Curated annotation (Swiss-Prot):
Residue ranges of the motif TonB C-terminal box: 597-614
Organism, as annotated: Shigella flexneri
Protein location: Cell outer membrane
GO molecular function terms attached to this record: ABC-type vitamin B12 transporter activity; metal ion binding; porin activity
TBDR beta-barrel domain span: 155-614
Gene name linked to the record: btuB
The protein, known as: Vitamin B12 transporter BtuB
Length: 614
């Protein structure tokens, strides 16, 4: 009997575009339909980043990893740990669904967007990134795309690492995975990272007083996982992690009032699951609990002072997913339930509230001759706004062997968060934000070049905005986003090249003005090679012009921010089979630029690190 992976591989095409280092079309991904499938059978553009990629790039943050990927635009209010936003294909930062091991990241706060500057890079073993609508599979938020951060380690062993760098950066990490008998595996990790940072000098955006201090970041992380195989088909796991972060930043100064310029974030997450992995049928049941407490306070008064603010969120989820091989493809179905609660006294929500959501979904994948068809439909029942349905469909045609045309259409939405509904400025009558997206793409393998080019359009309605006059949130905005994305990877002798180009025209559909903080064009290029046992890497990124607001005076003025070209250089050397040393220069030519108006970036930075494995 043919197993699922073999069958799906057999029905997949020979070679299609893959952006990351591992360019095999048979690389398995789980994010598209919640179960493993060869990447070549996923019609949506998909990128996989491995832990080996992260180590080779010597990334010290999740944002540094994501900024290298097609369609991603990262903005940040300064350096490490400072507030950041992820824009995928021009959509809002709140239109990106971030998963941790397939479970929605707990998001505290009124923005409803993921700030991955706070998520420890030490936990990341793999990232799967899908562009385009995915609400028909996952529900709310998946308008621009899905980022699935996977913490599960692939190989046993122990690693001890340490790193130092500019701005008094230091990082110490110990992780181990051990086999207990033939069927049980234990993983443990501890990580400490700290930087004094630098002065982001956000004068004008923070009131009338400049705050000449270093804006540092401290993070402490613990992780543990236990996995057990009951039989060849049945397995289970228990997993938990937590991190304790402190960030200093430049806050708005008001004479006579405490200066809330310190952020303290506590986050913990626990999940357990049971999986059945048969030859034709797969099923999994996962439950999770997460709790985050996000304080902003004046350190002279403490985080429990009446002037401090607190965002506290608890999230409970249950997921039951199933997949069965049918013909040259599969059919999947599942249900997931989520409950989010806030605690009375939370900064943006005066009283305790909860929001519950139950979703049922159906997915399908099938190959018929030279055609591949993919579809999904989902219905969500939300305690705040009732029932909402989404769907998507894609078709791929291999018109010549190794060349494929893809067309897709999908709907998606963004649910309201508790802060927007019941916060100080909340509006309980808000509707969800909605999206309709079209995409057409060609991809293939030509003379050793694995390439893909696509064009897309995204119409977003009922966007939630804030009214300065009524001091309330309301539905009124509309956005029209058009874009082109091109990716390619190829080898020339010992050199490996990976390149992408993005053109994004993201506009307010009512006023025809550009959406803020999105670069209109981006070029990204990665060059890797090995010479005399040294592993070298050069990263280039061009960020095009973008617009932002100058909040130093009212009425706020729109400002145009120029483009910039950035270069990084990284090198690694294996001293022995166990010990590797690495060095990196980020922003090699020390360019001055901003991604958020008024907030400086770090300039040239150096890091030196070493790791010992056994």
């Amino acid at each position: 009997m043919i197993k699922k992976a073999s069958l799906l591989t057999a029905c997949s095409v020979t070679a299609f575009s893959a952006w990351a280092q591992d360019t095999s079309p048979d690389t398995l991904v789980v994010t598209a339909i919640r179960f493993e499938q060869p990447r070549s059978t996923v019609l949506a553009p998909t990128t996989v980043v491995t832990r080996q990629d992260i180590d080779r790039w010597q990334s010290t943050s999740v944002n540094d990893v994501l900024r290298r990927l097609p369609g991603v635009d990262i903005t940040q209010n300064g350096g490490s740990g400072q507030l950041s936003s992820i824009f995928i294909r021009g959509t809002n930062a709140s239109h990106v669904l971030v998963l941790i091991d397939g479970v929605r990241l707990n998001l505290a706060g009124v923005s409803g967007s993921a700030d991955l500057s706070q998520f420890p890079i030490a936990l990341v073993q793999r990232i799967e990134y899908i562009r385009g609508p995915r609400s028909a599979v996952y529900g709310s938020d998946a308008i621009g795309g899905v980022v699935n951060i996977i913490t599960t380690r692939d190989e046993p062993g122990t690693e001890i690492s340490a790193g130092w760098g500019s701005n008094s950066y230091q990082n110490y990490d110990v992780s181990t995975q051990q086999q207990l008998g033939d069927k049980t595996r234990v993983t443990l990790l501890g990580d400490y990272a700290h930087t004094h940072g630098y002065d982001v000098v956000a004068y004008g955006n923070t009131g009338t007083q400049a705050q000449t201090d270093n804006d540092g970041f401290l993070s402490k992380t613990l992780y543990g996982a236990l996995e057990h195989n009951f039989t060849d088909a049945w397995s289970g796991f228990v997993r938990g992690y937590g991190y304790d972060n402190r960030t200093n930043y430049d806050a708005y100064y008001s004479p006579g009032s405490p200066l809330l310029d310190t952020r303290k974030l506590y986050s913990q997450s626990w999940d357990a699951g049971l999986r059945y992995n048969g030859e034709l049928i797969k099923s999994q049941l996962i439950t999770s609990y997460s709790h985050s407490k996000d304080y902003n306070y004046d350190p002279h008064y403490g985080r429990y002072d009446s002037s401090a603010t607190l965002d506290e969120m608890k999230q409970y989820t249950v997921q039951w997913a199933n997949n069965v091989i049918v013909g040259h493809g599969s059919i999947g179905a599942g249900v997931d339930w989520q409950k989010q609660t806030t605690t009375p006294g939370t900064g943006y929500v005066e009283d305790g509230y909860d929001q519950r959501n139950t979703g049922i979904y159906l997915t399908g994948l099938q190959q018929v001759g030279d055609f591949t068809f993919e579809g999904a439909a989902r219905s969500d029942d939300n305690s705040q706004f009732g029932r909402h349905g989404t769907w998507q469909t894609s078709a791929g045609w291999e018109f010549i062997e190794g060349y494929r045309f893809i067309a897709s259409y999908g709907t998606s939405y963004k649910a309201l968060n508790l802060g927007q509904l019941y916060g100080f400025y909340g509006n309980p009558n808000l509707d969800p934000e909605k999206s309709k997206q079209w995409e057409g793409a060609f991809e293939g393998l030509t003379a050793g070049v694995n390439w893909r080019i696509s064009g897309y359009r995204n119409d977003v309605s009922d966007l939630i905005d804030y009214d300065d006059h009524t001091l309330k949130y309301y539905n009124e905005g509309k956005a029209r986003i058009k874009g082109v994305e091109a990716t390619a990877n190829f080898d020339t002798g010992p050199l490996t090249h990976t390149v992408s180009y993005d053109y994004v025209d993201a506009r307010n559909a009512i006023t025809d003005t550009p959406l803020l903080r999105r670069a209109k064009q981006q070029v990204k290029y990665q060059l890797d090679w090995q010479l005399y046992d040294f592993d070298w890497g050069i990263t280039y990124q061009y960020l095009g012009t973008r617009y932002d607001k100058d909040y130093s005076s009212y009425p706020y003025q729109t400002v145009k921010m120029g483009g910039v070209s950035l270069w990084d250089l990284a090198v690694a050397y294996p001293v022995t089979s166990h010990l590797t040393v690495r060095g990196k220069i980020a922003n090699l030519f020390d360019k001055d630029y901003e991604t958020v108006y008024g907030y400086q970036t770090a300039g040239r930075e150096y890091t030196l690190s070493g790791s010992y494995t056994f």
